[in-house]
Swiss-Prot record:
The modification 1-thioglycine is found at G93. The modification Glycyl adenylate is found at G93. Its main location: cytoplasm. One of its GO terms (biological process) is Mo-molybdopterin cofactor biosynthetic process. InterPro entries: Beta-grasp_dom_sf (IPR012675), MOCS2A (IPR044672), MOCS2A_euk (IPR028887), Mopterin_synth/thiamin_S_b (IPR016155), ThiS/MoaD-like (IPR003749). This is Molybdopterin synthase sulfur carrier subunit. Keywords: Cytoplasm, Molybdenum cofactor biosynthesis, Nucleotide-binding, Phosphoprotein. One of its GO terms (cellular component) is molybdopterin adenylyltransferase complex. GO terms for molecular function: molybdopterin synthase activity; nucleotide binding. The keyword Nucleotide-binding applies.
């Protein structure tokens, strides 16, 4: 699915690198509103195993701002129309 405006009542989630490979998608739309801490739970329900294999080492942005889902930003509300990105670590050589 190409990134685009989320339908009413949804937010967009973008997958990069290993997250895209694991899900088989570059993006999708999920129901909103939801607390940031529940995004990983939603993804684990859709893609069993993604938590340990991918999400445990990922950075997350909400509307281009980095958030810490496991800490102080866990209660941040993801609203309709927001954009969440799942960004695995990038290695260089």
């Amino acid at each position: 699915m190409a990134p685009g405006k989320a339908p009413a009542g949804h937010f967009s989630i973008l997958y990069f690198a290993a997250a895209s490979t694991f899900t088989g998608k570059t993006s999708e739309h999920l129901p909103a509103p939801v607390r940031a801490r529940h995004v990983f739970t939603m993804l684990e329900e859709r893609y069993p195993g993604i938590g340990d294999k991918v999400l445990s080492s990922c950075a997350v942005t909400v509307n281009l701002e980095y958030v810490d889902i496991g800490e102080e930003d866990a209660e941040q509300q993801i609203e309709e129309g927001d954009e969440v990105a799942i960004i695995p670590p990038v290695s260089s050589g």
